[in-house]
Amino acid sequence: MLVDSHCHLDYYTEEELEAVIGRALEAGVERMVTIGVRVEQAAQVKALADRFPQVWGTVGVHPQNVGEAPIPTVEELVALTEHPRVIGIGESGLDYFYDKAPREVQQESFRRHIRACQRTGLPLVIHARDADDDIAAILAEERAAGGPFPALLHCFSSTRALAEAVVAEGGYVSLSGILTFPKSEELRAIAADLPEDRLLVETDSPYLAPAPLRGKRNEPALVAHTAAVLARVRGWDIAKVGEVTTRNFHRLFSQCV
């Protein structure tokens, strides 16, 4: 069994969805988390989770989208979580690569998402791109001010220092198809060293199809490719990857039963 801890199922057409879910189940992917990126999209996330028993959801505003509308308040974010199949908050974080919103706006949004996690106890799904120092600083500041909160560094491709900082505070790291890319030697070295009980896998589909399928549309079934590379770098078999990452997923997302 595998879990795709981060995908965007609402990006598929209605005609594609049944087939995408079906192929995931055939590949042994028995849980999928479809991710929130805008406030107005939360209803669609919840509808997908209601429709498919294998699908759960998160709610939040992606850092690339925070300049499109006023940042939701902490109270508004908490209200969005009030659904039995919402198991996390995000994805939120900082994206200084695209810089589609002012950095101070991204930072304020990130802080509000963290505070919503502190209020609800739900895990934070973190997006980090070219912003490692500010991500680590904000996480530490908010933890000191408001207390601990569970967190997942999604689609990890950042520095060893950021991964270790997240793990040191009890967080988790999710590996995507980037792990399979030929040039990802450093990422594979980090993945080999991270604590076993902090690892998850994901697709971030429909983006980031794994090697040798780069350039094609990604989907949850293909998380098996990432799992296979993780097995190789850890010296495990694929069954152990499934056992470890599924156990870690359920420990983090404890509302997913």
Regions found by a protein language model. Give the residues of each.
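Mid-domain alpha/beta scaffold segments of enzyme catalytic cores
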Residues: 1-257
